[in-house]
Structures are given as structure tokens and as C-alpha cells.
A protein has these predicted regions:
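Nucleotide-activated donor-binding/catalytic signature segment of Leloir-type glycosyltransferases, i.e.
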Residues: 245-267
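Acidic donor-binding loop of glycosyltransferase active sites
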Residues: 271-283, 296
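Membrane-proximal helix-turn-helix segments that form the acceptor-binding/catalytic region
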Residues: 135-168, 176
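Active-site donor-binding segments of glycosyltransferases and PAPS-dependent sulfotransferases
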Residues: 35-104
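Conserved donor-binding/catalytic core segment of Leloir-type glycosyltransferases
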Residues: 196, 200-236
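A charged, aromatic-enriched C-terminal amphipathic alpha-helix characteristic of glycosyltransferases
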Residues: 326, 343-373, 378
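Short hydrophobic beta-strand element within catalytic cores of glycosyltransferases
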Residues: 297-302, 307-310
């Protein structure tokens, strides 16, 4: 059997949009397996400038050439199952998919192991289905029934496609439980990579709160902006996306929206903010981990991956405060609680809490895991 260094590998991902957690995973995978070829359905090269993926050769699907696909790739979601099945991966020994939608549905040979790193089952097709319809104004009328039909089809395809995967890896125990619920499959947890070493945690804090996120409905950026607009507390918001204009209209003068910013700017703000505000129910949540690496406490909605990455007050050495409901009142109460006990949240405790999520740990564990799967598959032990 070939050693892993000589194995030909295809890495498959859905899309490369604004740099985020899944893009960091793909970049790390390519560092671990430099011989791998990268396949994505669609990507915007301009979004990858200054990132580790800027110089990476990328093979794309037919969606790449469709109108406005680079900017509004989600419009082509109904075509993505078909598109991912057109990738010809026959020449490769091993396939690794990085999937939050359809990448796990690639077609592989019987003797070709397929390892899928699942960021999440398709949230908008499963547990966020009804919320997605409401927030997208697709909860009534003819368009609503068309959207429901498409999402029904995607759920059927999604479950069917999960059977094409030999081994599931995932980001957290929280997502592993969802994979078991949706696909009836077990998944091994491998926490995603965070470049904690790029942050300093010993810089002076300044008088502003910070939110960093893509502007999509489930991130609840409008909730954060409305809560701070009501209290007048200074808030800086970094990120962009389809909800940006909707959120901007809710912002009062105490809220500063910076739009998309390069990594260096995000790092600078995380190192100076009083606290990060995070309102999403996220499967893992890279930004709260990055904030703690920068010595910045986290005020977060208390569901999902943050329960595994943030030590909530009143525990000893707390690194954050949780709020119990996605409402302005609940968030404002959490901010007040943080301010009342701010001296308890030390930069040193924040940094110590997230050392376990470093890039080197992810890369070491990924290589060992893939090597073990490769050896077992070749000997019939899968």
C-alpha cells in the first residue's frame, strides 16, 4: 500500500466566498496534503486575495460560468447536487470533502475511500428550514411553495448523499449529534483549526464592543445592532453579506459598520475590544475562539458550539457570558452582567482556554486520522 505522502487526493468544497471558518479548514487540509487537488463548485478569486488560497489552482463546476454565480452563488443551490456529481474524481486514490451543503455528495469508486469533514448538515434545509423561509420572505405565496419544493428535494438528496461517505469527521460534539439525528451516522470530532498564534492578548482594551460575522439571517446581526442602538453603547461591526443593507438601516450613530475587512484589521479590533458579541446558534463558531485567543471575552447566545468553547460566568476563570434568548432584552441583560463583573474576565484565562484549538493540533490530528483510515480501507478494515 502507498504511504500517505504518495497518495493522490482530491479535496472537494462547495464554494469559496468571503474568508471564513470553512475556508480556513480547506487551507489547512491543503497544507497537510500539498499533493491534493482542490475542487469547488464556484469561487470568487477577488475574495481570496491575501488569503492562503489566493495562489491555489482551483477546479470549478459549470456553475462558475453562470450569470452572477460568483457574487450570488446561493441562487444556484438547486443545481449544486447535480454540479457536484459531475466532478470526475476517478484518477484519485482518496477523496476528502469539506462539506456544509453538497460536497459530501461527490461520486466515488468502491475502492476509493471518501472522508467527509462535515461543518454542518444543511441548516436551511433542516432545523432552520422554517426560519429561513420566514426571514427570506418565502413563507407565503407561489414563491414559498417553490422554495419548499426545492428544500424538500434537497433534504431527500442530502440523506441519500450521506450514504456515499465512508467516514464522517466533524467540528464538535454538537454537530456530531445532529449528524446522528439527520443521517443516522456516527462522526468523529476533530475541532476546526484556529490560528491562535496570530493574536496578542496583552494589549490595552478600549471602550467598544465588537461583532464580526457574515451578514446572513441565522447570524442575527440585526439583533445585535438593534440591541446596541437602543442602549447607545459603542459597537463596531465587521463583515458583509446579503443582510448588510437591512442591518445598516437599523444602526444608530453609536454603531459603526465597517463592512468586509482584511484579517489584519479583524485581528487588531479583536485585540482591543472590551468583548465580542455573538448572537448565532453556531455549530462551532470560529470567531468566539479567535476572540479569546486575543484575550477578548465573549458575550454569546448560549446554544451550540460556544458551550464547548467558552467558559461561561459564574464558573471559575470565566471567558464569557451567555444570554438565553435571541432577543434584544436578553442580550442587553448579558451585556450589563458582563459590565458588572468585567474584572473577572482576564485575557490570560481567555487565551489559555483556546490553546487546544490551534492549527498545529488540527493538522496533526487530521494527518493521523486520514492515515489510519487509509490503512484500514486498504486492508479491508473500514
Amino acid at each position: 500500500m502507498k504511504p500517505l505522502e504518495q497518495v493522490s487526493i482530491a479535496i472537494v468544497h462547495e464554494w469559496l466566498g468571503p474568508p471564513g471558518g470553512s475556508e480556513q479548514v480547506v487551507a489547512c487540509m491543503l497544507e497537510v496534503f500539498p499533493q491534493a487537488d482542490l475542487y469547488v463548485l464556484v469561487h470568487d478569486p477577488d475574495r481570496q486575495r491575501g488569503t492562503p488560497l489566493e495562489q491555489t489552482p482551483i477546479r470549478t463546476s459549470f456553475i462558475q460560468s453562470l450569470p452572477k454565480a460568483k457574487e450570488r452563488y446561493r441562487l444556484y443551490l438547486p443545481l449544486m447536487p447535480l454540479a457536484v456529481e459531475q466532478f470526475d474524481l476517478r484518477p484519485y486514490d482518496l477523496v476528502i470533502s469539506s462539506s456544509h451543503a453538497v460536497a459530501k455528495g461527490v461520486l466515488t469508486r468502491a475502492d476509493q475511500p471518501h472522508i467527509s469533514y462535515i461543518h454542518t448538515p444543511m441548516r436551511y434545509a433542516w432545523e432552520l428550514y422554517l426560519a429561513y423561509l420566514t426571514e427570506s420572505r418565502l413563507d407565503r405565496g407561489v414563491k414559498s411553495w417553490l422554495a419548499r419544493l426545492v428544500l424538500h428535494y434537497l433534504r431527500l438528496w442530502d440523506v441519500s448523499a450521506s450514504n456515499r461517505v465512508d467516514v464522517f469527521l466533524t467540528t464538535s460534539p454538537y454537530v456530531a449529534r445532529r449528524i446522528q439525528k439527520v443521517y443516522r451516522r456516527t462522526a468523529q470530532v476533530l475541532y476546526p483549526p484556529i490560528n491562535v498564534d496570530r493574536f496578542r492578548h496583552d494589549l490595552p482594551r478600549e471602550d467598544f464592543f465588537l461583532a464580526v460575522s457574515r451578514f446572513v439571517p441565522y447570524k442575527r446581526m440585526k439583533l445585535i445592532v438593534e440591541a446596541f442602538s437602543e442602549t447607545g453603547k459603542p459597537l463596531v461591526v465587521i463583515g458583509d453579506g446579503p443582510e448588510f443593507e437591512n442591518v445598516r438601516r437599523a444602526a444608530k450613530p453609536n454603531v459603526q459598520l465597517l463592512g468586509h475587512q482584511p484579517n489584519g484589521t479583524v485581528t487588531d479590533y479583536l485585540q482591543r475590544a472590551r468583548a465580542l458579541v455573538f448572537a448565532a446558534e453556531e455549530d462551532f463558531g470560529n470567531v468566539p475562539v479567535e476572540a479569546q485567543a486575543a484575550g477578548c471575552p465573549v458575550i454569546a447566545y448560549g446554544k451550540g458550539g460556544v458551550l464547548e468553547t467558552v467558559t461561561g460566568w459564574p464558573a471559575s476563570n470565566p471567558t464569557g457570558v451567555f444570554f438565553s434568548a435571541q432577543t434584544t432584552d436578553s442580550l442587553q441583560a448579558a451585556v450589563q452582567l458582563f459590565e458588572d463583573h468585567e474584572d473577572l474576565f482576564t485575557p490570560e484565562a481567555c487565551r489559555r482556554n483556546v490553546e487546544r484549538f490551534g492549527r498545529s493540533h488540527f493538522q496533526r490530528e487530521l494527518r493521523a486520522t486520514v492515515n489510519e483510515i487509509w490503512k484500514n480501507f486498504g486492508t479491508g478494515g473500514n
